[in-house]
């Protein structure tokens, strides 16, 4: 009875939204105009590219702005980087090992008719790199020459990004980093911004805040997306409490082959599923656990899209210096049991780099194989080995180590994972480890300061390349949350940075991951997970970027087959 009432209430909530919903996949009277309705998240937390962390926020910005390059799905279903705001790029290797990219812009315009200039990218990239903005995506630019000096001094002119003239942008990198065009130049966080527009909108927001009650949330320069000046294929036309409508940007300068109108719907996941089932939206993300389970039942070969992160236990090297203890902690983990807590798509981690990261035309994880013994059959033997390692380290009883603490961000399934880990460590090793849930901000503060012993964290990367999952762990790196130091690892990563794309580079990347996990046991990967979405069968052309956000600019009606 309670379930029926809840479903009825959800259905009623969905129907009350109907008055502000456009028709699903509606076409105009002439049949040529296409409106696509999409649900990919809750109400956006921000429309500022350097702060957008949610999939829905990033998806909207992906349609409002255009970067130097953009990703496109080709006829074979492969996602490749093509020209965006730049019409071409020249690459030159310098005598000192640095590499300079020279972009020539195509002469595109902002939505107010003003020309897109190289200086707009300089402003946006300097703003991203500036420690004062505290963007989590600043490391995207860590490969740009002068990045560390700019951040240390606060002088962003030291960042090697400059406008040679209004249509020519130059960027110098510290090494080859062949993923620069594919990953950095297509990222949401490196989208261009007009400094004069940001300044004007900030002043307007400040004026509003002066007369608003203190109890109200502060206005931001991006608070009203319909006031934004953007350079992508769409502009924000109408904002309501539950929808944002984008329409074609008349000044884009390229023909839009997809929808003339995109309507983004903001709702919780359950309501999103109802809207999709009732054909009130054409695309929905994410699919529920129940829906994914049903697909697996119907087709055992069905696979969720990989999420580019690995949940892992971080060991603070300044506190857990003994290799035997770290290795014992990792061996005592039943990864099958932990992965089951992550949901229907959870799988025991085989390494730090998750599935979905490319190695040429192959998958890096598949090519590298399992670096972690995660079989349930071998768990008893691993526990025996873990006990022996503790004894060899001089700890006959786990209690000899005293009481330890395991920190984690108190959200999602992290709490259940923490409790399970601490039970395993107590049962197998006799360790007294107390789990403590904190906010995500508190966790990051502890990790950066080194004031932790054990911590759980989703290890992700700002780019879809194996190097980006490994480069943070070099000695002295400000993002090295393990406080790990190994000169051999540093040397490998230095070689990788200067290597061109190819088998030699990939071999070094596999060696670096092996050194980090198998030889040093610097951290203990636990599990990876997946996600899934739906685009109604009447459509073709949309795709999910491996980094998470979606692209609907190429969606079109599936041709009708006449029999």
Would you name each region that the model predicts?
Residues 73, 177, 185-257, 261:
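Gly/Pro-rich hinge or "lid" segments in bacterial periplasmic/extracellular proteins
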Residues 339, 373-379, 432-443, 468-538, ...:
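Extracytoplasmic/peripheral linker and loop segments enriched in polar/acidic and small residues
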